[in-house]
């Protein structure tokens, strides 16, 4: 019985030590790091910097990237990068304006999710096009002290209600 009691106390003691040694997460610092990734995402598009854009995404093979065009579905950053390289080749100017940015973080500081509304202005072959209110949502994950996008979805709202409710 003494052995069980000592074993119990030992387990309790080591459990307490391991729990109390956990470092406290500075959520404001994590928030700033996530915002930096999102800022780089925007900056990469404006500068047509494919390397910077790819650095915003996770290297994991099971990420999800959904664009506004019907065929824009990628499950890895390499194939998205190939398509984006072609797109950058056709754009003379890319300008983004972000508003209504919302960012949430898990209390453990390892997962973040966001929403932002983005206005896109592009020039191609002397022709300007503007796409207002592109809704962009996504999830970032912190792995090896680096935040990266693991899921992103962009959509264009339609005018009016498709179905009245």
Q: What feature does the model see in each segment?
A:
Residues 50-107, 131:
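A solvent-exposed, acidic/Ser-Thr-rich amphipathic alpha-helical stretch
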């Amino acid at each position: 019985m003494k052995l069980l009691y000592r074993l119990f106390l030992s387990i309790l003691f080591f459990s307490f030590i391991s729990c109390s040694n956990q470092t406290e997460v500075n959520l404001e610092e994590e928030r700033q790091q996530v915002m930096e990734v999102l800022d780089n995402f925007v900056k990469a598009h404006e500068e047509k910097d494919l390397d910077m854009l790819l650095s915003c995404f996770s290297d994991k093979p099971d990420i999800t990237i959904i664009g506004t065009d019907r065929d824009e579905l990628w499950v890895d950053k390499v194939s998205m990068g190939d398509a984006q390289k072609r797109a950058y080749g056709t754009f003379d100017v890319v300008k983004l304006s972000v508003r209504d940015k919302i960012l949430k973080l898990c209390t453990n500081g390892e997962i973040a999710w966001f929403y932002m509304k983005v206005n896109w202005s592009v020039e191609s072959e002397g022709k300007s096009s503007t796409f207002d209110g592109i809704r962009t949502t996504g999830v970032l994950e912190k792995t090896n002290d680096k935040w990266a996008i693991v899921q992103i979805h962009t959509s264009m709202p339609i005018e009016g209600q498709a179905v009245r409710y």
